[in-house]
Amino acid sequence: RPQRVNMAEYSCLIVEDSPMMRQLLVFALARVKNLRVTEADDGVDGLRKLASARFDIIVTDINMPIMDGLKLVKRVRGDPVHKDTPIVIITTEGSHEDRQRALQLGANAYITKPIQAPQVIATVKELLKIE
């Protein structure tokens, strides 16, 4: 992933079935300069959005109807266009086994709910390599 100049715009796909949690994530990530956020309400909607645009990072819940976040991670890692896109898992599933499974499937970071905005912001900035 090439380094970008200061004013570059980054794009983030948030995949989360809870409207309240989506709103919280959008609000938190609004503090990241030059980050454009797109929302999807489940894994299938997320894949639809991924098919029509490129994203620099994906933030996804695990427990969602239709297609869960782990299946989404698997599908993204199998897609030549997005296979290297950083993925942040945000979930209530906090066990060591759940974390290991998500990371083995290809997630880059794992944050348990309740989320703290500074942690989400720091994780996204770190994965995008922006200040």
What function would you assign to each model-found segment?
Residues 79, 93-94:
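Short, conserved "switch-loop" micro-motifs in signal-transduction and mechanochemical regulators
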Residues 39-57:
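Acidic, metal-coordinating helix/loop segments flanking the phosphotransfer/catalytic sites
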Residues 64:
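Receiver (REC) domain active-site loop signature in two-component systems and cognate sites
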Residues 115-124:
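C-terminal output helix
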Residues 19-38:
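Two-component/phosphorelay signaling modules centered on CheY-like receiver
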